[in-house]
Amino acid sequence: MLEFAPICIYLVISLLVSLILLGVPFLFASNSSTYPEKLSAYECGFDPFGDARSRFDIRFYLVSILFIIFDLEVTFFFPWAVSLNKIDLFGFWSMMAFLLILTIGFLYEWKRGALDWE
């Protein structure tokens, strides 16, 4: 248990700092009435043309999530490519299995029409 002490201390300190940083604004925030202009979106000195908090199409979120997933795939491939001459066949085939799983997922999303913009 002693070998985990630095990790536990780090987690406790991180939690305390996070809670302090979240709580300090509540101590110093003023309770004065706010003006509606302060709550509206600022558009370079002009009156806002419309509501800045409009809804986005769900396809934007889907495309962004797919981008993050495949961007992480590339992030995993860089260290693998650098150490390719040092790993054995198990490392090679495990990364090929990882690539196959992600390719199957990509083909599934493509077949379901997640990438079609209608």
Curated annotation (Swiss-Prot):
MF terms in GO: NADH dehydrogenase (ubiquinone) activity
Top EC class, one word: translocase
Membrane topology: Multi-pass membrane protein
Signal peptide start-end: none
Keywords, comma-separated and alphabetical: Electron transport, Membrane, Mitochondrion, NAD, Respiratory chain, Translocase, Transmembrane, Transmembrane helix, Transport, Ubiquinone
Superkingdom, taxonomy of origin: Eukaryota
Entry's localization field: Mitochondrion membrane
Any GO CC annotation of this UniProt entry: mitochondrial membrane
Spans traversing the lipid bilayer: 9-29, 62-82, 87-107
Enzymatic reactions: a ubiquinone + NADH + 5 H(+)(in) = a ubiquinol + NAD(+) + 4 H(+)(out)
This enzyme's EC code(s): 7.1.1.2
Keyword Transmembrane: yes
UniProt family annotation: Belongs to the complex I subunit 3 family.
Protein task: Core subunit of the mitochondrial membrane respiratory chain NADH dehydrogenase (Complex I) that is believed to belong to the minimal assembly required for catalysis. Complex I functions in the transfer of electrons from NADH to the respiratory chain. The immediate electron acceptor for the enzyme is believed to be ubiquinone.
Name of the featured protein: NADH-ubiquinone oxidoreductase chain 3
Native organism: Triticum aestivum (Wheat)
Lineage, opening ranks: Eukaryota, Viridiplantae, Streptophyta, Embryophyta, Tracheophyta
